[in-house]
Amino acid sequence: MLLPLYHAWACLCFCAALVLGGYVLVMMYGSVGTVRRRRDYEEFEVDVPPGSLGLPVIGETLQFMAAIKSGRGFYDFVESRRLRCGRCFKTNIFGETHVFVSTATSAKMILNNDSGKFTKRYIRSIAQLVGNQSLLCASHQQHRHVRGHLNNFFSTCSLSAFIQQFDVLIVKSLDDWEHRGTVVVLDEALKITFKIMCRMLLSLESGRQLEMLQEDVSIVCKAMLAFPLRLPRTRFQRGIEARERIMSALETLITQRRLARTSHEDCLNYLLSNDDETECKKDPKLTTGEIKDNILTMIIAGHDTTASAITWMVKFLGENETVLDKLRAEQVCFAKKMSGRPFLKLEDIGEMSYASKVVKESLRMASVVPWFPRLVLQDCDIEGYKIKRGWNVNVNAKSVHFDPAVHDNPFEFNPSRFDDESKLPYSFLGFGAGGRTCLGMNMAKAMMLVFLHRLVTTYKWRVLDPDSTLEKWALFSRLKNGCPVLVTRLAEETTDALAD
Ligand code: HEM
């Protein structure tokens, strides 16, 4: 998840390296002919994955940057090499060897990590922003400890308490869409998911405190894509300052909660309530530092991803009338069934069979987190090739999602492909897999389902701009145009007809 960020700031280094690159190239190899011989030699190595390491120093960084700049995203870069070299290939980006794998079997081996040969990449500048006790940066031991506590909170029973709150918030947010006519879905979804995350984590719903937090989180997110230069007014330094403000606001909130001993229905309350329990040597409570770093991590990891996923889902549905009709029929029937009961419950979500497949199919097609980077800790074999310690291996989720050998007609938006429960394991990687599977997976699915239910039973919409260009240098796969749609309220006769 962090590799794209690393590449973002590394691109600045790269520009400087470009100037030096030509010089170094000539100095190191003397002539272009020598460079060619080196590349030819690499291609004939038998036991390492195929693929070119490109030019000395700069590798294939130029091509990588061009793919990202094109707006089609990094997938183009990976896909052209996959077609040429096969499902396991190597390249060199920003001076490091990267191996890309795109089979469900390799995904299983790397993400499950039973051999302990892989670890999530640690990037110092990211750790400075989210905190080194964050799940994204913690050591193996600390990760297990923090994850254990958070897993308990994210269990189904906590989710059940939040469904109604999601629903109230979504109904309120969707209420004024019809008066606006044109709505940019991504902008609206970002507001909704930020509020939901802050409600669920800290019981913050509105007011100046929420606005300030949103501003600061956005500064931290932008800093993740910046060159990590700690000079006054640099983007990175502004991110560090925003982090400090967030930490201090969380510190105040935690102190107030401890002093007042008031109870709230939120994640912070859950983590602090462990304060009262007898100290357990095996699994001690989370420290204030761990709590603060991970609240920030969850806001960052949860709101942008879910908002992007919602946006793609609205686009795919808007462009696939048959699927939308089938979904609307399911949801309108459902709405009639629960008439008299104003808000949704966890059990309702469990009954939304087709809608759940729509969510899954949207995540497959969108591949919001397109690849998962890991660092190789020991030499190993993948797909019959030798992989060296210190290399990066990337599980290329998007290629698995679009592999015709795994998913029939992969470019068709067809939720019914998930009717068959016995699908190849690890063929759907929308939330990752193994010990690093998305912590908020169930929560994200629930948010998407509640949103979907309210949207399709209240509105019809038309996608105004079908452009699928990706936002450049965004944290996740986000639509550049944000998906503008024209919204109109559904006529009552339509919903009545569908329910009959
Ligand atoms: C549709 C929305 C979401 C998508 C597509 C998504 C996707 C992912 C993926 C693919 C990973 C694994 C990355 C890897 O293995 O390298 C991940 C990790 C993570 N996600 Fe999500 N996520 C979503 C929503 C959320 C939400 C709502 C939260 C809120 C808690 C969240 C918190 C996290 C955290 C903390 C991690 C790191 C887990 C760890 O390393 O142990 N995500 N997410």
Show the residue positions of the predicted features:
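N-terminal membrane-proximal hinge/A-helix region immediately C-terminal to the signal-anchor transmembrane segment
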Residues: 2-145, 160, 164-172, 378
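Cytochrome P450
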Residues: 2-23, 92-99, 157-168, 177-199, ...
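Hydrophobic mid-domain F-helix/FG-region of cytochrome P450s
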Residues: 15-26, 95-108, 132, 149, ...
